[in-house]
Amino acid sequence: MSRVGKKPINIPKGVEVSVQGSKILFKGAKEQKELETYGRVQIHLQDGTLSFACVDSQAQSRAYWGTYRALANNIIVGLSQGFTKVLEINGVGYKANISGKNLEMALGFSHPVIYPIPAGVEMSVDKNTITIKGADKQQIGQIAAEIRKFRPPEPYKGKGIKYSDEMIVRKAGKTSKK
């Protein structure tokens, strides 16, 4: 049985939740989100808590049970608090700045790398730190991964773009023969 699916979700102030058939509608201060469950789980909304139940006892139904509960929880947390990812740029001459609706980065290529900032996402650059904020956990993680992919950290000097909490395993360079 799913241990994740069993836990009810407390709905915080500032977030409204309504159920319409197999759809769950979430309304926050700034935006609205919806989650379609396609009838794979039963949805119960009562007294400021949202809970899910299995439709039947098949393994696939139990997997959906925990998945939809986690997705709903991520939407509620995103609408009430938001999600943040922080990237660090390390390297001589590597820098980033925001111009208009684009993130411009100098990453050692012969051209600047330009990444368009999607709607619903806030980005800020402070020295060599890029901060990405938004309500959609999946989107924030995807954007951070795409930016990191332009210049992932290399193991010898640690140059590149890395997550702020990422540890780079460093390698020793070549040793000379004597």
Swiss-Prot record:
GO BP term, example: cytoplasmic translation
Name assigned to this protein: Large ribosomal subunit protein uL6
Gene Ontology CC annotation, any one: cytosolic large ribosomal subunit
The family this protein is said to belong to: Belongs to the universal ribosomal protein uL6 family.
Protein's UniProt keywords contain rRNA-binding: yes
Keyword hit for Protease: no
Organism: Helicobacter hepaticus (strain ATCC 51449 / 3B1)
One Gene Ontology molecular-function label: rRNA binding
Gene: rplF
Subunit structure of this chain's protein: Part of the 50S ribosomal subunit.
UniProt KW keywords: Ribonucleoprotein, Ribosomal protein, RNA-binding, rRNA-binding
Function summary: This protein binds to the 23S rRNA, and is important in its secondary structure. It is located near the subunit interface in the base of the L7/L12 stalk, and near the tRNA binding site of the peptidyltransferase center.
